[in-house]
UniProtKB/Swiss-Prot annotation:
This is 4-hydroxy-tetrahydrodipicolinate reductase. CDD domains: DHDPR_N. Catalyzes the conversion of 4-hydroxy-tetrahydrodipicolinate (HTPA) to tetrahydrodipicolinate. One of its GO terms (biological process) is lysine biosynthetic process via diaminopimelate. It comes from Beijerinckia indica subsp. indica (strain ATCC 9039 / DSM 1715 / NCIMB 8712). NADP(+) binds at R37. It comes from the Bacteria. Pfam families: DapB_C, DapB_N. It catalyses: (S)-2,3,4,5-tetrahydrodipicolinate + NAD(+) + H2O = (2S,4S)-4-hydroxy-2,3,4,5-tetrahydrodipicolinate + NADH + H(+); (S)-2,3,4,5-tetrahydrodipicolinate + NADP(+) + H2O = (2S,4S)-4-hydroxy-2,3,4,5-tetrahydrodipicolinate + NADPH + H(+).
Amino acid sequence: MSELKLVVAGAAGRMGRVLIQTAIETSGVTVSAALARPGSLALGQDAGLLAGCGEINVPITEDALAAIVDADGILDFTSPDLSVELAALAAQARIVHIIGTTGFSVAHLTKIEAAARHAVIVRSGNMSLGVNLLAALVKKTAAVLGPVYDIEIAEMHHRMKVDAPSGTALLLGEAAAQGRGISLSEHEQRGRDGHTGPRKDGDIGFVSLRGGTVVGDHTVIFAGPGERIELAHRAEDRRIFGRGAVQAALWGKGRKPGLYSMLDVLGLGGE
């Protein structure tokens, strides 16, 4: 069987380098191209050398259209605007697009959904096995405990993260909302300040902390009468996201076009 040829977008960034490393280390996968933004100092450098893996004869380029020629998929942890552009290219080429980018607007998501009519797109706020298992647990717990238990989601990331709440926190919030059979957008409460009054019944609260080099900490709190349940995940190594992304690309090869999540990849979509 031929190797899965993957394009790594955002190759010069922290996650881009992790994706290159992971793809190189994974049997049956090869890095066929690597992308960086126009003007990046990484342009022209060998992707393998930049990622600390040794030379792989893949120079980093800014030409996304040329990069996807003969590729089977794109690994994309970049920015909302760029992810939308790459989704359109993936749709044209009928290839797999793995999106780990966060911070999307409704308009961004609408465009990605449109692209998924012609491409296999796996989008998730977190690609790790642990977080997606946590999401399944959160959904089940929310359903069992019911609205008498208040739900709060706390997350902490490194000081350079630019969006809040994190994509993972929103993923967990959506899981909680699904467990209760409600809409997250109608019940989310992002931060509190000043005289807020009593907590509203049914709210799902979010609090975001930023500092240091924290890869990602998430805790879902179910606070009920006389007791509190906490479900948590601590990310200690970005390679967990890289492994999940490559696993998703392997899973997506040959599937029918559509918008999928990591829950689908892990066989938890029906949970």
